[in-house]
Amino acid sequence: MKDQFASYFEKPEFKRTLAHYEEMLSSGDTRYFEATELTEIAEYYAMNGDSQRAEAALDYALRLHPDNLDALIFKARARLINGHLNEAFNIAETITDQHDREVLFLKAELALANRQHSIADNILRAMIEGEGHEAETYADIIDLLVDNKQTDMANDWLEEALARHPRKQILMESAAYSYAQQERFDEAIEQYNQLLDMDAYSALYWEELGKIHFLREEYDKAIDAFEFAIAINGDSSYYSIYAAANSYFNIGNYERALEYYQRLHKVYPETVDPLFHMGMCCVNSGDDDQAMEYFTQALATVADGSEEQAQIYSQLSLIFSRKTQHEKAISYVDEALKIFPDNTELIIMKGHEMLCQGRYDESTEIFLDALTMNSQHVERSLFLIGVSMLENNYYEMSYHILRLLKENPAIEDELLYPYLCLCEWVLRESSFKSTLATSLSISPRKTYEIFNLPATQGESVDAMIERLNTINQSQSAV
């Protein structure tokens, strides 16, 4: 069964190989890698949209292993993906064994890309007949068609396969994969549940089921599935441990999420992701000092100039901002900007720190630069600037900016309305009650957080306003 979410690339052993390869590129040296290692690296780059690096890895593989079948097939597919169909055909023709099973699959794939569906079907028909209509062959064909987004053909082959081999486990796996890829999640879940009836101790089935629930944001169900996989495979269940941690994180159970991230870090101490997320759990739990320790440890594990390094610098900047150490915050955001100098969110962060210091003119200049740089997607920048103005008590300016974004699809109402509420409350706008009602209905947790109030389940708008008035009167009396 195919892993539709490419969890292999999250595993530390792959990350180590990738790091060794990238170190080789940086140093200009040459090192020996197995052809399989290089094709996996190429697949990783391709999955992340970096076709140039993918092909470079394949070229290096063919330099070391010029007749390697897997590398040649992958190279042909890479050319195909990049729109060079003729080159892909030419590479396929150079392969010595034209009757190799994987070469036939490649030829079918090339025919599909050339919209020669009947030729592709003939190749696949000859294969299924030559292999005696075996269930395993059907499964491979269905997976190929699904991967090439030939939904109708895949469904026809699946129907035929299940008619010949009803309740054959490998075909049920292909069916589940196909349904998941087509986002027919209810049917995919049903298939995985049937597979689990056959093999309740399959960590793979539990993991795949968890992934679907995670995609549907059904985090409680995802956690149940991932924890079954973990119970079966223990610490070797890297993906399931990571996904369970992420699921707990997404429902705000940072204590439980932290336990899973710590478990990952203990087993895979050289991997940065658990350390970074351990820091984020502490940030969200209000423990900035512990978060700083984790982020500092994480810095020691990342490559200079990497995206991960920039993310850590930005989090450290935010921590020092909350500690009102704004010069220190600026120093860390400057480090992040060395890596991504055109990142408008980082630029706005720097402007925010200057505004916190009362450097209004300088911050305004930086904000305007950010808006100019991000003119095609200005709404997100405006929102961040509006929030910065609000947090620095420039309520009228903040309200003017945020009000421009009402009913703008680029900014989700769940993000916008709590901040609008606070502006309207401070400015005593007549629309406050209506805005508060909307905010409580779509983003209750953030609304209470913005007003620094403990959440009260089922509280009416009038009751919350009464609480706010009581607090306001108490503060005025003091």
Model regions and ranges:
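TPR-repeat structural position
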Residues: F14, S51, L85, H117, ...
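Start-of-helix register in tetratricopeptide repeats
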Residues: T36, D70, E102, E136, ...
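Residue-level recognition of tetratricopeptide repeat
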Residues: E43, R77, E109, D143, ...
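Register position in tetratricopeptide repeats
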Residues: M47, I81, A113-N114, D147, ...
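Canonical tetratricopeptide repeat
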Residues: F74, L106, D140, S174, ...
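TPR/TPR-like (Sel1-like) alpha-helical repeat modules
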Residues: D97-H99, A298-A300, R403-A410, C421-T447
